[in-house]
Design a protein with these regions (language model features):
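Structural recognition of the conserved hydrophobic beta-strand(s) that form the central parallel beta-sheet
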Residues: 117-123, 144, 153
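Conserved lysine of the Walker
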Residues: 37
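Hydrophobic anchor at the beta1->P-loop junction of P-loop NTPases
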Residues: 29
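Short regulatory helix/loop adjacent to the ATP-binding pocket of P-loop NTPases
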Residues: 126-142, 154-159
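Interdomain hinge/linker elements that couple catalytic modules in large macromolecular machines
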Residues: 161-299
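Short glycine-rich substrate-engagement loop in P-loop NTPases that contacts/grips substrate
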Residues: 59-88
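Pre-Walker A adenine-sensing motif
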Residues: 4-22
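Hydrophobic positions on the alpha1 helix immediately C-terminal to the Walker A/P-loop
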Residues: 40, 44
Length: 299
């Protein structure tokens, strides 16, 4: 069963899911790792229970759990079939189902064999969002989930925006935290721009050292490991060097707004000694750099 903890609502996404409830397409929630997809599934499960759906009508499977991660598609099908209640509509929730080989066969079989409403999450570590419709024969609707908006950032961190009046009568918006300490709106927005909108930040507060440590872990997982793993599964043998990928990312980030070419990326990295790690000899080919840049664009 999907584990539970304190859930913070993401109403804009939850309302989209509710709008597609009990419709034929498979609901696929996509987005970057750690952006809140699993929590959205839990919110939808809670909504169903609050509106009268019985717990036994809901089947939840999290494929990051040790209970399920070694299952085959046949195992998943049998697990669900054993829990189907005849004459009842079932609600199936699959978190990171794409870890299972031939997962789409099981999902398509559920649609044919049972009266069910299906919800699936998937990160870019396994499939690009454009690939889901292909695997599900076009019978899916995608909910693209993003990190927190600024409004959500305020809510998650317990900030309250109030309109106050200055001594001269001017109205302005100020922000108050849970302890009623007051901040200028631009201060909080600066924190949002610096730390970003990953929901997990709310669990550690806005202490810079903790936040940066958390973000570094997310960056290493999302940008480096996920891209390398996905491209390896897709047979892209050129994309195997995490150091080169990280350097290309840093180069592109440092040159936002500038015109750069594929050739200039490799040349600059070598000329500035950024690839002098004792492993890579010479300038990476334009074809190799292009493959890494394409992987970043698609992720």
């Amino acid at each position: 069963m999907i584990d539970s903890h304190e859930l913070r609502r993401r109403d804009s996404y939850l309302n989209k899911l509710i709008g597609f409830q009990d419709t034929e397409p498979v609901k696929v929630i996509t987005g970057i790792r750690r952006c809140g997809k699993s929590s959205l599934l839990k919110l939808m499960v809670q909504h169903l229970k609050d509106t009268g759906v019985l717990p036994e009508q809901i089947i939840e499977m999290n494929f990051e759990s040790f209970d399920f991660h070694k299952m085959s598609a046949d195992d998943v099908y049998r697990y669900v079939k054993e829990r189907i209640i005849a004459g009842k509509r079932m609600y199936l929730f699959f978190d990171e189902l794409q870890r299972i080989k031939a997962w789409e066969d099981a999902v398509n079989a559920f649609r044919v064999d049972f009266d069910c409403d299906i919800y699936v999450t998937g990160s870019n570590a396994y499939l690009l969002s454009s690939e889901y419709a292909t695997y599900l024969s076009g019978r899916c609707v995608e909910i693209k989930m993003l990190p927190l908006s600024f409004r959500e950032f305020l809510d998650f961190h317990g900030f309250d925006v109030r309109e106050t009046q200055s001594a001269l009568g001017w109205l302005r918006k100020q922000v108050f935290d849970k302890n009623n300490e007051r901040y200028e709106l631009r201060e909080v927005f600066a924190a949002y721009m610096r730390f970003g909108g990953m929901p997990g930040i709310a669990d550690v507060g806005l202490e810079q050292e903790k936040v940066l440590a958390l973000l570094d872990g997310i960056y290493s997982t999302v940008v480096i490991r996920d891209i390398l793993e996905r491209e390896t599964r897709r047979g892209q043998k050129q994309i195997t060097d995490p150091a080169l990928l990280r350097k290309i990312i840093l180069f592109l980030a440092d040159n936002i707004g500038s015109s750069v070419s594929i050739a200039s990326i490799g040349n600059t990295l070598v000329n500035e000694g950024l690839l002098d790690d004792g492993k890579r000899k010479g300038t990476p080919s334009a074809h190799t750099v292009q493959a890494y840049v394409n992987a970043l664009l698609e992720s």
